[in-house]
Amino acid sequence: MPNWTKFDAEVIKKTHGDIFYYRDLYEGKHSEIFPRAKELIEKGEITDNIMYGTHRAKNVRTPYIVANLCKLIPEIPAMLVSRSIGNIQTSFSPDDFQAENINSDTDEIVDEPRDEVSKIINVQQEVIDQIQKNSHLALEHWGNILQQQLDGGLVGVPWLDEKGLRLEFKARDVYYPHDDGLGVDLAYEIEIDEQEYLHVYREQVVNGDLHTRHMLYLLNESRKTEEVPEDETKKLLGMNELEKVYPGRGRPFVIYWPNEKTFMNPLGISCLKGQDGKQDEINWTLTRNAITFERNGKPRIAISKEIMAALQERAQERYGDESKIDHRDLEITTYDDNGKAMEVIQIDITKIGDIQWVKDLMKLMLMETKTSEKVVDFYMENTSTSAQSGVAKFYDLFTSLIKAEQIQSEYIYFLQQLIESALWLANYNDPAVVIEEPEILLKSMIPISRKELIEENNMAYTSETQSLETTIRRNNPNASEEWIQEELARVEAEKTSNDSFSLMRGHQTIQQFMGNRDENGNPIQNNQDDE
């Protein structure tokens, strides 16, 4: 169990490594972390206007060039996975027994009219929907996955307070697990009345029950702590109780999601680990090329001494200054005795630097991080501009999709465990809420046309491998639950109804309905026999 006698950057680094370094790497603050860049900036050979402003660059023309591939590496799986997360549905169907248990506590959890709590029909789904609304979950998926990839881990915490039942997501550096594996501390640095405090939230399993506790420490200038008394802690944090016990809960509510967990790195590692050296070399090569181009890229004119003397003489006669050479005098010139005349010299900029070396480094970074080259549209000069089929696109993105599917399955498990913890909190106060791991619907990672989507799902429905409700949900992934239920009812109502007569003799035609008689009332069968 952590002993909070001091809290500073070293405490964070001891548990989580140098996560702030990887954040700077992602944000493109390379001129602050790479030694070669800092040295050139200090010498004045290059500048970084974004980091240091234009006042440092008034005598420098070459910028520090950053091709930030470290930004794409975590963003690509975040983009693929986040767009594939659909609605969250309960595994239970609404039943009368659960509806009868609705009470004022249920009404407090769900945003419904206060005077008619019985209007809540599907309690379980309403509670899950309320958790999503309170958590703004639809807006959190991309950031959650990105932060987990970047830091190497993500923390999820369920809360039930005056803000409602919700999920909160925290960066890795607040998470401090206990050595015995039976608890966890979350440490937040907060400021109250211009005074810095360390707020520690502890969850610990004792004899099969979960004990939670809030602690507050005063931080001095040397970052050492002094525990604040309980009465003052309640006042500063605005809480009536600092400790709670949840009988029967044998594991913490807090859920931690590591990235690429191993025995050597049980809390996970950043996806950018080991990529900083190659990123530095890419920036260095591009910046060195820029310096070379700045010095040698502009065209220069080479002329003989005789021509230069003639130009200076004309400038002296015309302007009184031999240095004011008129460019019009260069349009017509003469040859010297050796046939030499004016020459225009310009370096071939395509030969400057090692662009192929940069491409190889980028390719190596993508390979090590399991990122498809095509997903960043990198090698475009030799590719065809014709349209590709969905299968071709799939194989172009194959490596990234494999990585994204693994992240997707882990993220779904992470969300299910978090929602189960939130439902556990709700059930503790209200038995009408059932504890479960809900179903999370998935959408395609690769965008497909509306036509392809409908054809795929309709085919599954007609071949009886998919239900009507699932078909409607997948055809309308952004529709609300109310709309889906109404659409399902409309489709069911429009189906041809069956009765005992139709089941025995088949569905009636218009002629059968008219008693097998024509519009004049004559029997159709007799007329056919006469003929």
PLM features: what roles do these ranges have?
Residues 1-183, 520-531:
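Extended, helix-rich architectural segments
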Residues 138-149, 157, 291-297, 350-451, ...:
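C-terminal amphipathic alpha-helical
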Residues 145-151, 155-269:
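Extended, regular secondary-structure scaffolds
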Residues 152-159, 466-474:
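Amphipathic alpha-helical protein-protein interaction segments
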Residues 235-392:
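Extended, charged amphipathic alpha-helical segments
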Residues 449-473:
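C-terminal structured domain segments
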Residues 477-485:
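Short, basic interhelical loop/turn and adjoining N-cap
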Residues 487-531:
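Extended, compositionally biased alpha-helical segments that mediate assembly or anchoring
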